[in-house]
Structure formats: C-alpha cells, structure tokens
Amino acid sequence: KFLLYIKSEGCSVCEADFPKVKEITDKNNYTSYYIQADEMAEAVGQLNLYTVPVVILFYNGKEIHRQARIIDFSELDYRIKQTL
C-alpha cells in the first residue's frame, strides 16, 4: 500500500498541497512517493493523468482512490485509514 502524489513545476496549488499530503501520510505512517509530471511523461501516460496535483492510493497492487486538481484532505485521510 502506498500513496503517489504527482505535481508539476510551476504549479502553485501543487506546492501548497504537498505539505498537507505529506502531513497526512507521515501522521498515518503511510508509504508515499512524489513525482514531477513534467519529468516522467511515461508515468503520466500510463496513469492517465490530465491535470495536477493528483493523489492516488494503491492497495494490494490496485488503485483504490484518486483525487485530482482539488484535494479533499479529510477524505484522503479517511481513505488512508481504511487501508491501515
């Protein structure tokens, strides 16, 4: 299980949301990975990403939750807790 946070350079929303996402994952001792969309075009295509920021939760090798552009942090925290 892990969280993937995708952002891009020059995205002010991405920079504002990043510490909030990190706080939630740290608080829940949840594995997380962060990637720059503009540096990983292949991953962007494989994950069907059309906007940033994007948060994707994976559990047992499958995507179980995705939020894009506007992240609901209470929903994200709830979804993470469901997998603990």
Listing of model-derived features with the role each one plays in the protein:
Residues S12-V13, E39-E42, I71:
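Short alpha-helical
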